[in-house]
Amino acid sequence: MKDILLGVNVDHIATLRQARGTSYPDPAHAASVAEHAGADGITIHLREDRRHIQDRDVYVMAKTIQTRMNLETAVTDEMINIALEVKPEYVCLVPEKREELTTEGGLDVAGNLEKITAATKTLSDAGIKVSLFIDADKAQLDAAKATGAPYVEIHTGAYADATTDEAISKELEHIRQGVKYAASIGLIVNAGHGLHYHNVKPIAAMEEIYELNIGHAIIARAAIDGLDKAVRDMKRLMLEARA
C-alpha cells in the first residue's frame, strides 16, 4: 500500500501571533520546523478578513518553504490575483464566511460551476495545481471533475464532529464512498478538517487518499509537546494506518 502525505497547516501559529499583535510566533519559522519533522507540505489559508495569516506571510513562505505550499483561498478576484502573483504549487479553493470560526462546509461547486471553472482555468493556466474543498457528495464530485481541477479535498468535519459510534460509522462510510468515487472518476483525493490524533487513522487507512491536511490538532499538541514531536507523532499514526 502506498504511503500517505501530511500537509501541516500553520494558520494557528499566526492566530497566536495576531492575538497580541506581535511579530511572533512566525508561521514561516513553524513551517520550517514542520518540514524538518517530516511534513510533506505546508498549508496556509489567507482569509479575506486576515484573521490569522497575513499577506506578508504568504509572500515570505512562498520563498522559504522547502516542500510544497498549498494556499487556501476563497473564490474571489482579490485572492485569485494574489495566488497568480505568488504562484504556490497548489491552490485549494474553499468557501468562506466572515462570521464562522473555521470553514464550516464544502464548496458548492455544483451551484457555482461557471465561477469555479473560470477560477480553476485561470490558476491552471499559470501552472498552479488546483484543489476544491468539497463534501463527499457525488453531485459535488461530478461538478469538481467538470471544472478541470485535478484535485479535491474531502471535508472531514462532520466525521470529526460526530459523537456517537453510529454517527461516526455513518460519516466514515459516507467519506469512504466519496473517496472511492472521486478516485474512480480520475480525481486525486486529499482530505482534511477536524482531524486529530484520535480520529485520523480510519481516514488515513483509505488507500485512495493522497494527502491529509491537518493544522489545529498539531498546533494544539505542539503547545504541550513541541512542534517537532507533534508533527512526527501525527505522521507516524498516518503511516501506521497504511501499514
From Swiss-Prot:
Keyword Ligase: no
Pfam families recorded: PdxJ (PF03740)
Catalytic activity: 3-amino-2-oxopropyl phosphate + 1-deoxy-D-xylulose 5-phosphate = pyridoxine 5'-phosphate + phosphate + 2 H2O + H(+)
Pathway, per record: Cofactor biosynthesis; pyridoxine 5'-phosphate biosynthesis; pyridoxine 5'-phosphate from D-erythrose 4-phosphate: step 5/5
InterPro entries: Aldolase_TIM (IPR013785), PyrdxlP_synth_PdxJ (IPR004569), Pyridoxine-5'_phos_synth (IPR036130)
Keyword Cell membrane: no
EC category: transferase
Cellular component terms (Gene Ontology): cytosol
GO biological process, one term: pyridoxine biosynthetic process
List of catalytic residues: H45, E72, H193
Residues involved in 3-amino-2-oxopropyl phosphate binding: N9, R20, G194, G215, H216
Keyword set, alphabetical order: Cytoplasm, Pyridoxine biosynthesis, Transferase
Cellular compartment(s): Cytoplasm
Subunit comment: Homooctamer; tetramer of dimers.
This protein's name: Pyridoxine 5'-phosphate synthase
Organism: Pseudoalteromonas translucida (strain TAC 125)
